[in-house]
Amino acid sequence: MNVIGIESSCDDTAIAIVNSNREIIANVVISQYTEHLPYSGVVPEIAARAHLKNLQYAMKETLNQAKINFTDIDVIAATSGPGLIGGIIVGSVFGQAIACALGKDFIAVNHLEGHILAVRLNENISFPYLVLLVSGGHCQFIAVLGVGKYKILGQTIDDAVGEAFDKTARLLKLGYPGGPIIEKLASKGDPHKYSLPLSMTKKSGCDLSFSGLKTAVKQLIFSIESLSEKVICDICASFQYTVVQILLCRSINAIKLFESYCSNNFKINRKNYFVISGGVAANQYLRQEIFNLANTYGYCGVAPPSNLCTDNAAMIAWAGIERLNANLFSSNFVPRAKWSVEEL
């Protein structure tokens, strides 16, 4: 079975073809980097127009990569939320039009579910498992009991991790997107040079907060008269270290909540998995620290490959396959900007 996946929820136009044997036959991503760079962030209207321009080319390139045509396609899956509504509508309607023309099923996919299930495209891990989903717009600890069966154990009460990275990069005039730039500079800096607040780490539960950290970084930057390359590297290292320490601290509580929740609702596996996914999970320092923590608590730390952590259509196609296999889909779905995984 061959499934086309379409992803357009933010600033990357992506189309992929994945089959039911867990093979990525084609995977095309068209970046909108140059369109948004002058604004140091994503402009929704510009993003939607770029998706409209890029989708037809991306589809043609995907079919060329796969060396197949539309008659070999069985199902169309497209991100239908959450995210920037303009881009979501463009991608979802594009997918529905193709499905209608081919007489094939259309599956509306939750973007976050794509991140949650992406690890199973490569690892084929069993349910249940714990996910730390860290991206530009979301930061959540999620108990994954099965396809469409999710419990949010904790989440950010204000800003997402990726947003904090981008904001810090803007303050330092480093460019966009901020995550990869800060990670690179942090490797050259001293992570203990500047002390930054470990927000909410003393509280129970596993909710998170990054607004205080953003404010502290802003105050630190404005207090330094000359931002030399060494100083910038030290700020990046201290910021990244603090983010990771916050996530590690809250992960310990998340593991305890996950085990408690599963013991009441599900038979937990002998081998437990702690998955980190989402765009920020491409950060190798964060990934390794989470793996180390998972191992300490008897879990196997896993993550999708870096190219499946950032927004991509292969994870959307795979989520479509998972939903099709579970018979959990409806072609009649209205795209939405907000859509919790607990509503699936």
From Swiss-Prot:
It is found in: Cytoplasm. Its cofactor is Fe(2+). One of its GO terms (cellular component) is cytoplasm. It comes from Orientia tsutsugamushi (strain Boryong). It is an enzyme of class 2 (transferase). It comes from the Bacteria. One of its GO terms (molecular function) is iron ion binding. CDD domains: ASKHA_NBD_TsaD_bac. InterPro entries: ATPase_NBD, Gcp-like_dom, KAE1/TsaD, TsaD. Required for the formation of a threonylcarbamoyl group on adenosine at position 37 (t(6)A37) in tRNAs that read codons beginning with adenine. Is involved in the transfer of the threonylcarbamoyl moiety of threonylcarbamoyl-AMP (TC-AMP) to the N6 group of A37, together with TsaE and TsaB. TsaD likely plays a direct catalytic role in this reaction. This is tRNA N6-adenosine threonylcarbamoyltransferase. SUPFAM superfamilies: Actin-like ATPase domain (SSF53067). Belongs to the KAE1 / TsaD family. The keyword tRNA-binding does not apply. Substrate binds at residues 133-137, 166, 179, 283. Binds 1 Fe(2+) ion per subunit. Keywords: Acyltransferase, Cytoplasm, Iron, Metal-binding, Transferase, tRNA processing. The keyword Iron applies. The gene is tsaD. Transmembrane segments: none annotated.
